[in-house]
C-alpha cells in the first residue's frame, strides 16, 4: 500500500470516527418538548422519563402542583414561548420543594417559582441537594425559601439575572435565598427585595461571589439582614446596591462570621458598593465577628451615619458617607451619581487577590441585567453610568 493511500484511509477513518462521535452526542442530548399539547404533558412526567443530557423545552403557561425530583445528570430546562409559571398549589416534591435537584449538573432558564409551603416551614422553589445548578432569568416569590441548598461541600450554585422577592415563612429562619455549606455561590445581575422577616441573601458557602446585583429591601420591606455570611468563607461583594428598609427589626445590613469561621480561608472584600441605611434610628452597615479574617473595604458609598471601620480591624479606604442628594433619584432606588457630584473620578485601585483585580468591570442595570463598563471604574459606589 502506497503512502498516499495510507494517509487517505487514515483521514477517512478519522472523519468516520468523528462523525460517529458527534452523532452519538446528538442522540444522547435529546431535545424534548413539554406541555399540554405534547406527548410529555407535565414537568413531573419529564423528570420521571429524563435521561442524562436531556434538554427540555417547556411551553409557556401555568403548571399547577406540577412538582418534580430531578436526579439525572446534565439536564437543561428552558421556557419557550414566554414565561413558565410553576405554582405549588399545596404540593411539594418529597415534602421539600417545587423541584428537588439531585443530579450532577442542571441549567434552568425562564421559570417562575411561587407558593412553596411545607409543614417544616422550609418549602423552597428549588431545593439543591447536590451537583452544580445554574439558574438564569428565573423568579422566586411567596415561597418559604426562594432557593434552599443542603450542606454539600461539592455543590455549586450560580444565579444570573434572576429575582427573589416576598419569600420567607415570617419566622426569621427562612429567606429569599438560603445557601448551606457548599463549595461556591455566584450571583450576578439579580434583584433581591422584600424578604418576609428573613434575609435577602444568606450563605454559608466556602466562596461567595456576589457582583452587580440590587439587594434593596424597599418600601414595606421587613427583611432582617440584606447579606449574611454566618460561617465566614471568602466573600467578594463587588458593585452591588444594598439597601436596608426603614421597617427592619435588625439594625445590621451585612453580617459576617457570626456563627464562627468554618472554612480554612476567611476573607471579606467589600468593593464599590452603594450601601443605604433607611432605619430611622440608624443601622450598622457591617458586622464582622472577631477571628482570623481578612477585611478589605474600598470605594463604597454609605448613605447613613454608620462607618464601615466600626466593624473591627481591616483595610478600609476611600469609603464616603454621602447624602441622598448625591444621587439622581434615591427615593426610587436610582443611585447613579449626579453629573455635578464632587465624588466623580475619586475611585482608587482596590488591589488584587490571587492575581485578579477586585475592581468592577460591569454594573447592575434594572431590572435584572448586567452591563459591561466601557472603561475602568472611575467613581466610588456601584454605578458608573449617568442619567
Write out the residue ranges for each language-model feature.
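Extracellular beta-rich repeat passengers
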Residues: 44, 55, 59-60, 64-387
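Right-handed parallel beta-helix/beta-solenoid
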Residues: 19-45, 49, 60-62, 326-330
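N-terminal export leaders
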Residues: 6-11
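N-terminal hydrophobic targeting signals that begin at the initiator methionine
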Residues: 2-4
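Sec-dependent N-terminal signal peptides
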Residues: 13-17
